[in-house]
Amino acid sequence: MSEMTPREIVQELDKYIIGQDAAKRSVAIALRNRWRRMQVDEALQPEITPKNILMIGPTGVGKTEIARRLAKLARAPFIKIEATKFTEVGYVGRDVESIIRDLVDIAIKLVREEAMERVQHQAADAAEDRVLDIMLPRAQSFDQEDPSAGTRQKLRKKLREGALDDREIEVELRASPMGVEIMAPPGMEEMTNQLQQMFQNFGGEKTKRRKMKVKDALEVLKDEEAARLVNDEDLKAEAVERVEQNAIVFLDEIDKVCKRAEQGTGGDVSREGVQRDLLPLVEGSTVSTKHGMVRTDHILFIASGAFHLSKPSDLIPELQGRLPIRVELEALTTDDFVRILSEPSASLVHQYQALIATEGCELEFTEDGIRRVAEVAWEVNSRTENIGARRLHTVMERLLEEISYSAADRGGQQVTVDADYVDQHLGGLVQDEDLSRYIL
């Protein structure tokens, strides 16, 4: 689990997301509270439940990006899912309990990677020994003379220096279990997983011989030895524990399962049903998975939605009560667009410069050029649908279409994108509202 303070978390998010300070602060506090809870007296820990968050804001302002970046910072089991993918129990489609099953699988992968990282040195030594045994076989009986320890050490030294990397050897590897593809209707993933495991276990453990270079053999054998040193049963127990104590679920598009007041009765039956099915998970219940029972009492849920056609009050009252922290994200301004284009280390401007540089052509953006691109994006958003920062992708792609097409023929040249260049390539489209609706 991350031990970063709220201030450090916000600073890290600032590198990738412009503005939205209120949302960043709420998420940072929620993440820090996970750590704080683990520090209090054990008798009090079960009583401290997470304060779930509802993020409200138009599309393209950074709700999903905050979730993506949070996943990397959290170092905890994290899953991002769209609420629209699920249906009420009894209808065709995935039921909400599959969220927890997927979360446990993610946690097992995370814990296994950490465990294998811890035994890397032991695995590397074991892999070296296996390669040395192939190149310099040990004595098979007491009567045979064993190669001197000195020869083996000399060979080990050469191996570590990389002098034997290109030599080809034949190694015996564990064969991958036979893959069986089973097709099943949505919502039956648990059954198909169990059937696949059953078929894989039929064959038992088999080995196969492969010829490869020493360098490649060391890598493959190191992974195999690391997997051998890791206890799967311990991994599963630790993964379930992590899910119960530290996991975070990001529920996107929660507004799409709202039933609007003006719709009256009838309509989409499974919408409200999805909300009712989510209730036990968010409130705290026990979900059965193939790795054991998982309690959801201390899983943090962060829900988000644009709420264009509905309001947070259209959620069923019980679910509203389970999302006590409300954060409103602001629509982006021209100045925000300028910062989005220039400040992040992997901004759109830097991405296009790196792509065009591969052709030997230098792409340069002036300050007034970047501002003009931001103004065009904001203008198109205000005239047509406001899709936030995603509009920048469309505008930039249209602006640099000619350069991208002819970059291979412009090796050694420098192309400067200033305000005049932007007006020349996009001015007509921005003025013509009908064209901008379809093209930008």
UniProtKB/Swiss-Prot annotation:
Superkingdom of source: Bacteria
GO terms of molecular function: ATP binding; ATP hydrolysis activity; peptidase activity; proteasome-activating activity
InterPro entries associated with the record: AAA+_ATPase, ATP-dep_Clp_protease_ClpX, ATPase_AAA_core, Clp_ATPase_C, HslU, P-loop_NTPase
Residues noted as binding ATP in the record, renumbered to the chain: I18, G60, V61, G62, K63, T64, E65, D252, E318, R390
Cell compartment(s), UniProt: Cytoplasm
Location of the region described as Disordered in the Swiss-Prot/TrEMBL record: 138-159
Subunit structure, interactors included: A double ring-shaped homohexamer of HslV is capped on each side by a ring-shaped HslU homohexamer. The assembly of the HslU/HslV complex is dependent on binding of ATP.
UniProt protein name: ATP-dependent protease ATPase subunit HslU
Source organism (scientific name): Alkalilimnicola ehrlichii (strain ATCC BAA-1101 / DSM 17681 / MLHE-1)
